[in-house]
Amino acid sequence: ILYLQKPHIGTDKLADVVKHMRLEIERLGGEVRFGVRLDSLNIKNTGNGDSKKLESINVTDRFLGKAEVIECDRLILAIGHSARDTFLSLNESGVMMQPKSFAIGVRVEHSQEMIGRNQYGELYKALPTADYKLTHQTKDGRGVYSFCMCPGGYVVNASSEKGMLAVNGMSDYLRDGINANSAIVVTVGVEDFDGTDALAGMRFQRKWEKKAFDAAGGKIPVQLFGDFKKNVVSKEFGNVRPQTKGETAFANVREILPGEVADSIEEGITAFEKKINGYSRDDTLLLGIESRTSSPVKIVRDDTMQSNIKGLYPCGEGAGYAGGITSAAMDGIKTAIKITGGK
């Protein structure tokens, strides 16, 4: 982690890392509550015009069914980018938020052997598992790019809401799976959403995630690239078979994406053939949809790292100020420095 350009822990080892982080927090006097949901904020006027400040928070222990009010004049809100119930609650409480652009698309799967031979040559087995990073600008000006590439990894059913489906990718520490997968995504913004309010992007995600769920009956929709181009449901696999955490079913993946996004993905994958031989093979697998690349909202904050509600410090990926583990950690450090005055 200290010296590698792209350090890799592995999803299988990450759980143990997080456990030891929790133990260190507890050793330092912190408390970690499992299954406790933030329901709402209790806010009061400061008496200075329209200025408001945080007074306490309402939480519920979902295991015990017990509600509690926690006195709190400073709250670091480091939520994830899929905390939709919290986004709704914050919006109802008058916390200033804006819609934010993000990217959606699919996961593609290829043979890891094919990727290795293309990246390293015949001695690929003697070298670390090969990865790649690809970008393309379409004739319409949209950017198509690979995201969160997982060498020797799995495509994961990462659904978090009933009746909706989203996928993600993961690799174990050894990266020894037979397939390579990566998100191939296209940026979408307010001009693509149905509305300009703070939650327009979240509604956009839900719309397409519901289509993904319905398309394959709750299983991960999968389609061969050759059939994606023809706009027909696949009937059988070629040389590449899905390597997933969660069941798959054939569906028309093109129909669970906005038309402009689907067209851009087709153009992008075709263009990537010039960089990786075999990338646009007809039996390349497309699994959908990848819709959680980053937060669909930005919680507005000032130079003190506080929102319009004094004492509320939104930070990290869910707040719209980071796009991954490292940038989220750095934003958390900046927030802590502001609160402590640099101590």
Language model: regions and residue ranges:
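Residues forming the flavin
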Residues: 1-343
